[in-house]
């Protein structure tokens, strides 16, 4: 029965993207159900299908995201982490992975030196001497070397663990096509059940967040975090080129989706979106 229900759900999702507007098709479907003598039995059956679909989708989403995250953390702590730390610490002369780390380390050391001289000028450090200053600078330099060596080894560990998690995620998707089909049908039902105002609100929220006026600042922070997470150089030119092109491409794809699909599925939602966006 579950396979038959899945086929029925997928067929209903396909019907919603047909030539006839969804509002008219829903009206005819409502009349058809009201005249059907088996309407009560079908209503109970649809409730069972919806309940099974919801439970299966929630379980699949939890499994789909929790397993890769757990594997990522476990592999970093017990597999890649100790191995990379051992190899990286064997050569004490290798500290930085890229020039961005060097620039940040030198900037921190320079700020520490300026702070040290400021404390000497205001009398916070009693009887300052060149030996004391050299000792404190050496101590700070060693501290920075340890911190950035750990950051470099963690970046390599992150790359390996992330690749493993992505491989696990893709393998789960490939090996669970039926569960993915159920999830897709559930999301379609969830989206189509929203009111036109809710759809328009979500569209505006999505566009303003990712392609709106203030989105470049958010993209800049996200790209810097990703580059630092993977140990890649934080090139300002690359970041500026990305935030000046990717949101534009995303906005073009989104507008094409509205024109090509959403305008056929729910024209009233598109009209509400334009009214709210004005």
UniProtKB/Swiss-Prot annotation:
Species, as recorded: Gracilaria tenuistipitata var. liui (Red alga)
PANTHER family referenced in this protein's UniProt entry, alphabetically: CHLOROPLAST ENVELOPE MEMBRANE PROTEIN, CHLOROPLAST ENVELOPE MEMBRANE PROTEIN-RELATED
Name of the featured protein: Potassium/proton antiporter CemA
Chief location category: plastid
One GO BP: potassium ion transport
One cellular component term from this protein's GO annotations in UniProt: chloroplast inner membrane
Localization terms from the record: Plastid, Chloroplast inner membrane
Keyword field: Antiport, Chloroplast, Hydrogen ion transport, Ion transport, Membrane, Plastid, Plastid inner membrane, Potassium, Potassium transport, Transmembrane, Transmembrane helix, Transport
Membrane topology: Multi-pass membrane protein
């Amino acid at each position: 029965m579950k396979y038959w229900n899945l086929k029925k759900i997928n067929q209903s999702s396909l019907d919603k993207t047909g030539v006839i507007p969804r509002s008219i098709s829903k009206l005819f479907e409502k009349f058809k159900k009201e005249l059907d003598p088996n309407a009560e039995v079908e209503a109970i059956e649809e409730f069972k299908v919806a309940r099974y679909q919801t439970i299966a989708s929630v379980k699949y989403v939890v499994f789909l995201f929790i397993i890769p995250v757990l594997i990522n953390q476990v592999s970093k702590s017990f597999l890649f982490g100790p191995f990379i730390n051992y190899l990286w610490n064997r050569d004490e002369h290798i500290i930085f992975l890229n020039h961005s780390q060097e620039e940040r380390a030198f900037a921190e050391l320079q700020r520490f030196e300026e702070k040290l001289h400021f404390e000497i000028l205001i009398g916070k450090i009693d009887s300052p001497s060149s030996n004391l200053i050299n000792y404190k600078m050496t101590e700070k330099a060693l501290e920075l070397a340890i911190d950035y060596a750990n950051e470099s080894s963690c970046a390599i560990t992150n790359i390996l663990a992330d690749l493993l998690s992505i491989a696990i995620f893709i393998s789960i998707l490939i090996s669970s096509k039926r569960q993915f089909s159920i999830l897709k049908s559930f999301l379609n039902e969830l989206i189509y059940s929203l009111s036109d105002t809710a759809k328009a609100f979500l569209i505006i929220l999505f566009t303003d967040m990712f392609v709106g006026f203030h989105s470049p600042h958010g993209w800049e922070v996200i790209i810097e975090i990703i580059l630092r997470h993977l140990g890649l150089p934080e090139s300002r030119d690359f970041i500026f080129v990305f935030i000046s092109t990717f949101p534009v491409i995303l906005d073009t794809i989104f507008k094409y989706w509205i024109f090509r699909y959403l305008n056929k599925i729910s024209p009233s939602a598109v009209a509400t979106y334009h009214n709210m966006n004005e």
